[in-house]
Amino acid sequence: QQQHLGVQSMATKAALGRDADYDAVINVSAFSGIVDYQPDELILTLRAGTPMHEVESTLASANQMLAFEVPDLHKILASQSAGTIGGVLATNASGPRRLTAGAARDYLLGFDAISGRGERFKSGGKVMKNVTGYDLSKLICGSYGTLAIFDEVTLKTLPKPETNISLL
């Protein structure tokens, strides 16, 4: 029997895209927490349901940041929070720094995921040059959970710049 399954954690991006009629929704909010953080190596491995405020505070404690500057759209989308890292990657959400630094998918080094058949699979690793063949990270980011459900992701981080200027 074929069913249409939706994937969500905090449902902060539910207003994006077209309306969907799901038979069931898989809530992945339990896939949460920092698995491994190596500030000296600029590598962060975490579960996909980890809230963005936790990701940002962890990185700030080591004076680091995500290069792709996650846009905080929670007020525009009428959601309670900025969401999770899995939602950011599933939508490839990237802010104004995308023009110079790149998108979220450019900093996804590797991931563990669950396919539509319920099978676990891995792609990539913990270093920048780790892909031979298809780079599934580039494909999965921005797929809105239609190709796979992220379980664990490894991201490249960057040191925070000493100065920061905003132009309004």
Which role fits each region the language model picked out?
Residues 1-7, 28-81, 89, 93-126, ...:
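N-terminal glycine-rich flavin-associated loop
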Residues 7-13:
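Glycine-rich beta-strand-to-loop/alpha-helix junction loops that act as flexible
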Residues 14-20:
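Short glycine-biased active-site loop of nucleotidyltransferases that positions the nucleotide triphosphate
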Residues 21-26:
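Short, well-ordered secondary-structure micro-motifs within conserved domains or adaptor modules
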Residues 134:
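Internal, glycine-rich beta/alpha segment that forms the wall or movable "lid"
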Residues 139-162:
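Short, acidic (Asp/Glu-rich) active-site segment that either coordinates a divalent metal cofactor
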